[in-house]
Amino acid sequence: MSHPALTRLRALRYFAVMPSLAPPLSDWLLLEDSMTQRFEQQGKQVTVTLINEGYIEREALTDEAALLPDEPRYWLREIILNADGEPWLAGRTVVPESTLCGPELALQQLGQIPLGRYLFTSSTLTRDFIEIGRDAALWGRRSRLRLSGKPLLLTELFLPASPLY
């Protein structure tokens, strides 16, 4: 199953050099903390619509493959993050199978829980980078995060109703 917002997310083109961003854009796109928490700070109830979840083969990755270890399988989770029922963000998380051991096995059990609620409670979370991308008028970002040193890739597309615009 797919969703039009996830098609747009996969169409993001990333800037080779960090673009100059006005403060409202940079405040959202370069946020180091939880996007879920940021949405909740807007006074919104955040919910998850789960679109896809399960293992994919390496061949299903596009340019993401260059940012992750070479493995045969990856855990994929694609969601829409809603604020008071309105879609604000499309998210795609790709987790190498080798990351899914120990406490990180919980990444497969999130269900309707926003990823940020899990990630940002971990004292072992680090971020390698944030890449800024754009598809027509929509902005997005991609980050390689690490839990206990183990990588995962998170891509987020800000939808038209989000406060970024």
From Swiss-Prot:
Its EC number is 4.1.3.40. GO terms for biological process: pyruvate biosynthetic process; ubiquinone biosynthetic process. GO terms for molecular function: chorismate lyase activity. Keywords: Cytoplasm, Lyase, Pyruvate, Ubiquinone biosynthesis. Substrate binds at M35, R77, L115, E156. One of its GO terms (cellular component) is cytosol. It is found in: Cytoplasm. Removes the pyruvyl group from chorismate, with concomitant aromatization of the ring, to provide 4-hydroxybenzoate (4HB) for the ubiquinone pathway. HAMAP family: UbiC. Belongs to the UbiC family. This is Chorismate pyruvate-lyase.
